[in-house]
Amino acid sequence: MSNLEIVTGAGPVGSAVALQLAEQGINVRLLTRSGSGPEHPLIDRRRVDVSDSEALRSVSEGATAIYHCIHAAYNAADWERELPAAEKVALDAAASIGAVVVFPESLYAYNSDTLMTESDRRNATGGKRGVRTALLRAREASATPTVSVVASDFFGPRVRTAHAGERMVPKVMAGKKIRVIGSADQPHSFTYIPDLAAAMIAAAHNPELWNSVIHAPTGPALTQRKIAEAFARAAGASPAKVGVLPAWVLDAVGKINTDSRELAEMNYQFTKPFVMDSSASEVLLGLSPTPLDQAAEETVVWWRAEQARTAAA
């Protein structure tokens, strides 16, 4: 059996997947336009345009799995223009070499006001949510085996552009006040990115889970205030000072600012409970979520190392 697996993209998800695969002794070919990504003896970083079907097929020859971890700018127009075509290239390449494709997925396509489970309908429409629905349907219709691994908002090493990323963690570490969107005290699920990566790998290696949608192991729902407090504890910082940017403000600014409008589309996730349940998938995967205090500590350790690296540059 081949000992080669492909990862497209070296963002937080792709990097976490590549490192975990390498740590398991698997040869990884990490594909990006720039040849970037984490360093490891078993990670072969390649400059490849993964939107080029022939280039992706050629470099993936002999692989048993493709982890498709690329994305697009955070707006619906770019998602609709770029993501379906990019996923089709990955699916076609995998079909030609007999590989499974594993996708990280969000909760955007879910259309539930209650606890979100693997059995929920994923049929949201409009904007970015509608794009995610269309992508899930295309995967389901493909003859190529796929697994979509759903996570809530990320946090963890290398996570920057997220609600619990650079807008929160380094500020809390420094004892500064943060402002969160919607509400600081509504229950909200947060997924630790190494747990998502572990779930993607486990799913790829278990054919019984192919052609399904599963949930990454995700701990009990927190609130934005509670996760900020966890980072403060891990950093030995003063208690987190948390303010709120009301949803209506983001809505108003979104009328004149594109970036704010794209964020405002997701206000519903932070003005009422937004909670996923991963218990069924945890049984199937044989995995459980990393305890919050451990995950927060590992996140703070990464940020401290990153700050030291930046200061020394």
What is each model feature region?
Residues 106, 137-159:
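Conserved beta-loop-beta element that borders a ligand/cofactor-binding pocket
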Residues 160-167, 181-205, 211-215:
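Substrate-positioning beta->alpha
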Residues 31, 69-70, 101-106, 149-151:
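SDR active-site strand-loop-helix element
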Residues 4-24:
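N-terminal Rossmann NAD(P)H-binding glycine-rich loop of SDR-like oxidoreductase domains
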Residues 80-84, 121-140, 162-166, 189-190, ...:
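Short-chain dehydrogenase/reductase
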Residues 36-97:
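NAD(P)H-binding glycine-rich loop region in Rossmannoid oxidoreductase-like domains
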Residues 85-131, 147:
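Conserved Rossmann-fold NAD(P)-dependent oxidoreductase catalytic core, especially the SDR/UDP-sugar
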Residues 2, 11, 200-262, 278, ...:
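Mid/C-terminal beta-alpha module of Rossmann-like enzyme folds, strongest
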